[in-house]
Amino acid sequence: MKFFPRESGVLLHITSLPGPYGLGDIGPEAFHFVDVLHEMGQSLWQILPLGDTGSSICPYITVSTFANNPLLISLDGLIDEGYLHKDDLKKIQSYSSDRVDYQKVYDDRYKILDTACTNFIKSSSAETQQRFDAFCKENEYWLSEYILFQTLKKLNNDQHWITWQPRHDLVGEDIIKENNVFIQKLKIQQFLFIEQWQKLKTYANQKGIRFVGDIPIYVAHDSVDVWANPELFKLDEHGKIKYQSGCPPDFFNAKGQEWGHPGYNWK
């Protein structure tokens, strides 16, 4: 009987990597950690979900099942790619070395990413633009709903979608036209993440390191997936949760846990 070869590795989420910008990302420190794993004789790097957490921060509560987290984009990488200058980062280098101020990181990084996206629009090469167009076409099946949801989120002051007007009253060509630049930048963020992630993954694989990923069991209520497909979840007529996810009492938590995701409508 053949068995899988014995392997070992380390669980360390990307955000837990050290770095000067308040939160770990898929930049130089991630490549360095690959080197460390290789030198230790490890072959696996386990990480938590990489999805776009929005303002929730929790990797198990994501805005989209498919979109990746722009907060994990390497700012140093954006400098190397020509979309940022070192001067752009001077105003965000005053972080604590032992604690993460998530709100500050969230605010600062998205301001910097906005600058990078503006520079991408202005100066990306023809070859890069072709890759970007191909990325958008290949991922249209989820990207179109994601950018629409995020645009409506912005227009509704980041409020939960159950407080919005009905979809047919919100969605129209005018919204797309009036927010075209914002929408384009959402696409660029997703593209930049994938470009950087593929470089990290390729480097890790060359060093004999494979990633062990993770995905949430359920889908977050305030997500594009539930907003666009409410019939797939246990919701009432107002979009509120009828049955939610959780965990019964166990050794780790005598009271049990409420996770807050809507249950699936298996029918």
Label the model's feature ranges:
Residues 17-28, 261-267:
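Active-site mouth loops of central-metabolism enzymes
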Residues 2-3, 28-53:
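Catalytic domains of carbohydrate-active enzymes, especially glycoside hydrolases
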Residues 28-35, 134, 195-203:
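Short alpha-helical segments and helix-capping/turn motifs at coil-helix boundaries
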Residues 46-56, 215-221:
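Short, solvent-exposed turn/loop segments enriched in Gly/Ser/Thr/Pro and often Arg
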Residues 186-220:
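Conserved, well-ordered alpha-helix/loop/beta-strand core segments that scaffold catalytic motifs
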Residues 2-6, 13, 56-194, 219-267:
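Alpha-amylase-like alpha-glycosidases and glucanotransferases acting on alpha-linked glucans and related
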Residues 8-12, 43-46, 211-213:
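Hydrophobic faces of well-ordered beta-strands that scaffold small-molecule active sites
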